[in-house]
A protein has these predicted regions:
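Nucleotide-activated donor-binding/catalytic signature segment of Leloir-type glycosyltransferases, i.e.
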Residues: 216-234
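Short alpha-helical donor nucleotide-sugar binding micro-motif in glycosyltransferases
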Residues: 130, 230-231, 238-243, 324
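Donor nucleotide-sugar binding/catalytic pocket of nucleotide-sugar-dependent glycosyltransferases
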Residues: 124-170
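Conserved donor-binding/catalytic core segment of Leloir-type glycosyltransferases
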Residues: 174-207
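Nucleotide-sugar donor phosphate/pyrophosphate-binding loop at the beta->alpha transition
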Residues: 98-100, 109-128
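Short hydrophobic beta-strand element within catalytic cores of glycosyltransferases
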Residues: 259, 264, 268-271
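A charged, aromatic-enriched C-terminal amphipathic alpha-helix characteristic of glycosyltransferases
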Residues: 302-342
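Aromatic "clamp/platform" in nucleotide-sugar-dependent glycosyltransferases that forms part
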Residues: 251
Length: 352
């Protein structure tokens, strides 16, 4: 089986969507499934308004068609609702090709925070985008319930995993900082609600790993906080393993893969009781969720690092990949995905 995933989020971006897609492809290959990507690479781009450090592609119809037809996939999945996602959707609609989508980012809330455009407008746009899909994949029960209440249909599950070989507690970084260390990691941007963490009265040291448009402002405002910049690979793992508590202040993520990455490093998580933490942490003894984030941070201190690690060991990317592939396989050929007689680049396309 050959799957094409269209995504606006791609390297060199460092975020949960990119990590999810690359981990999915690696695990799917081990199951005998090839995943190709339609990405912004090779297209003209422009800086995203209000976030110039993040660039968005400007795809053209002919090149989109050329790339898809060169791959000739058995199934098409659209992972993002940016220009690449809309272009892939338009291609499928023109040719009556079935496709699935996933809901991974709260763009309506992001846009509202940055521009003041009501989230209700954004959700109307996203309902239209996803309505044409054979299935909208979501990662958690709480997100499925929320989107269902907002009028989204044909919702299915695709959970997330963690690379427990990469993320492990074996070699924590030697941080010469007062303990306990409360750490957050991710894009330093207003929609991540990092200031809710930085403003807390906590013992020890607060540490921020990551970069983004709000970093300079927050460094000036909170000089006592240690900003370490972007970390990758083993360097990231060692820093997560060095923390006493991982703090996840975001209220706009749809899952928060970094929670599993911290847990795999043996680090308990503190978070607000919102989609993502409610599903990952819940009432497991691996962290604390509370509307009072300070209380959650202090309660998470001292939780068993071994329990955190064991919890993560049960969440593999292979299981996530099996679920994703199963969603696509279930749609062929008895539902909307059926082989067509049109052969492109030596492979058979799918037509709905």
């Amino acid at each position: 089986m050959r799957i094409l995933i269209a995504t606006d989020a791609w390297h060199p971006q460092v975020n949960g969507v990119v990590r999810t897609l690359t981990s999915l492809a690696r695990s799917a290959a081990g199951l005998g499934v090839d995943i190709d990507f339609l990405t912004p690479d090779g297209f003209p781009s422009m800086g995203l308004p209000t976030y110039p450090g993040l660039r968005i592609a400007l795809p053209n119809r002919r090149e989109i068609a050329k790339r898809i037809e060169a791959i000739a996939p058995d199934a098409i999945h659209i992972a993002t609702e940016g220009p690449i996602g809309w272009a892939a959707r338009a291609y499928c609609r023109r040719r009556k090709l079935a496709f699935t989508t996933s809901y991974t980012t709260r763009f309506p809330e992001y846009v509202e925070v940055r521009t003041g455009i009501p989230a209700s407008v954004g959700y109307a746009v996203l309902r239209h985008f996803h309505a044409a899909a054979s299935m909208i994949m979501v990662a958690t029960d709480s997100l499925k319930a929320e989107l269902g209440a907002r009028g989204f249909k044909k919702l299915g599950f695709w959970t997330r995993g963690v690379d427990t070989d990469l993320f492990n507690p074996d070699s924590p970084a030697e941080l010469d900082l007062p303990r306990p260390i409360f750490m957050t990691m991710g894009r330093v941007a207003v929609e991540k609600n990092i200031e809710a963490f930085l403003s807390l009265n906590l013992p020890g040291t607060k540490v921020v790993v990551g970069d983004g448009p709000q970093r300079a402002e927050l460094e000036r405002k909170y000089p006592q906080v240690k900003f370490l910049g972007e970390k990758k690979g083993q360097d990231l793992t060692s820093h997560l393993a060095a923390a006493d508590v991982f703090v996840f202040p975001s209220k706009t993520d749809t899952f928060g893969v970094v929670q599993l990455e911290a847990l795999a490093c043996g680090t308990p998580v503190a978070a607000f009781p919102v989609t993502g933490p409610l599903d990952v942490i819940a009432d497991h003894p691996i962290g604390a969720i509370d509307e009072n984030l300070q209380s959650a941070c202090l309660r998470a201190l001292g939780m068993s690092r071994e329990t955190c690690r064991n919890f993560a060991l049960e969440r593999s990317w292979e299981n996530s990949a099996r679920q994703f592939i199963g969603n696509l396989t279930a749609l062929q050929p008895s539902r909307s995905l059926r082989p067509t007689s049109r052969v492109v680049a030596g492979r058979t396309a799918v037509r709905g």
